[in-house]
């Protein structure tokens, strides 16, 4: 698996859009620079989630773009997805690693410094730092890391950090400069009038920052 799969992660938010139309949107973003897609659809049933996941894999697999499943090891296994992104209430990471084996990616979401320090001993591939800034997609976020919090987290963390929450073209450069290995986002992609253009701009920002 390419090490920089977490450079620019598109987190899904299909809502009422048809699957066909949404796949066109995802494909446009992937062709413009998204490096992996995170399946996050909390309103779907297990069966619906599998169906949507299979549809995503049908366009992502030929392009060798990883599909990461939010919250569920079982969905990851049933889809044979590339990996899983787990939150603090989504089960035991060590057990997840035993179930998934060494070939699957595991991301672990943290909201506090204590959680981050604990993550240093866990068998994960990257750490999701959430939320960076205020965002409509995480209205209940009680801790916003901001740039200084991200810098502190990077200095203390043993894993690559993917910054999540409220990131767009206006702040992505500073996020990478503060030490993030990548960014994951919902709103900046889904609210864009031209998703391809926004994706290209974000990818250029990330690539430029990581080269420095």
UniProtKB/Swiss-Prot annotation:
Associated pathway: Cofactor biosynthesis; thiamine diphosphate biosynthesis; thiamine phosphate from 4-amino-2-methyl-5-diphosphomethylpyrimidine and 4-methyl-5-(2-phosphoethyl)-thiazole: step 1/1
NCBIfam families from the UniProt entry: thiE (TIGR00693)
GO terms, biological process: thiamine biosynthetic process; thiamine diphosphate biosynthetic process
Needed cofactors: Mg(2+)
Binding, 2-[(2R,5Z)-2-carboxy-4-methylthiazol-5(2H)-ylidene]ethyl phosphate: 166
Function noted in UniProt: Condenses 4-methyl-5-(beta-hydroxyethyl)thiazole monophosphate (THZ-P) and 2-methyl-4-amino-5-hydroxymethyl pyrimidine pyrophosphate (HMP-PP) to form thiamine monophosphate (TMP).
Family indicated by similarity: Belongs to the thiamine-phosphate synthase family.
Molecular function terms, GO-annotated: magnesium ion binding; thiamine-phosphate diphosphorylase activity
Reactions that this protein is recorded to catalyse: 2-[(2R,5Z)-2-carboxy-4-methylthiazol-5(2H)-ylidene]ethyl phosphate + 4-amino-2-methyl-5-(diphosphooxymethyl)pyrimidine + 2 H(+) = thiamine phosphate + CO2 + diphosphate; 2-(2-carboxy-4-methylthiazol-5-yl)ethyl phosphate + 4-amino-2-methyl-5-(diphosphooxymethyl)pyrimidine + 2 H(+) = thiamine phosphate + CO2 + diphosphate; 4-methyl-5-(2-phosphooxyethyl)-thiazole + 4-amino-2-methyl-5-(diphosphooxymethyl)pyrimidine + H(+) = thiamine phosphate + diphosphate
Residues involved in 4-amino-2-methyl-5-(diphosphooxymethyl)pyrimidine binding: 38-42, 138
Origin: domain of life: Bacteria
Keywords for this protein: Magnesium, Metal-binding, Thiamine biosynthesis, Transferase
Annotated Mg(2+) binding sites: 71, 90
Name of the protein in its database record: Thiamine-phosphate synthase
CC cofactor note: Binds 1 Mg(2+) ion per subunit.
Name of one Pfam family that matches: TMP-TENI
Stored InterPro entries: Aldolase_TIM, ThiamineP_synth_sf, ThiamineP_synth_TenI, TMP_synthase
A single GO cellular-component term on record: cytoplasm
Enzyme Commission number: 2.5.1.3
């Amino acid at each position: 698996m390419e090490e920089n799969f977490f450079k620019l992660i598109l987190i899904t938010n299909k809502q009422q859009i048809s699957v066909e139309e949404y796949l066109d949107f995802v494909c446009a973003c992937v062709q413009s620079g998204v490096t992996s897609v995170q399946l996050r659809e909390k309103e779907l049933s297990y069966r619906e989630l599998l169906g949507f996941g299979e549809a995503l894999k049908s366009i992502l697999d030929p392009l060798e773009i990883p599909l990461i499943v939010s919250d569920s090891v079982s969905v990851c296994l049933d889809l044979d997805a590339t990996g899983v992104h787990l939150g603090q209430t989504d089960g035991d990471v060590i057990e997840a690693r035993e179930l998934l084996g060494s070939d699957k990616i595991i991301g672990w979401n943290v909201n506090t410094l204590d959680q981050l320090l604990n993550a240093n001993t866990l068998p994960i591939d990257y750490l999701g730092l959430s939320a960076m800034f205020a965002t409509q997609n995480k209205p209940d976020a009680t801790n916003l890391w901001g740039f200084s919090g991200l810098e502190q987290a990077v200095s203390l963390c043993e894993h690559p950090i993917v910054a999540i929450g409220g990131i767009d073209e206006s702040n992505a450069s500073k996020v990478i400069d503060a030490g993030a290995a990548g960014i994951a986002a919902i709103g900046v992609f889904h609210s864009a009038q031209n998703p391809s253009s926004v994706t290209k701009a974000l990818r250029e920002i990330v690539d430029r920052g990581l080269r420095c």
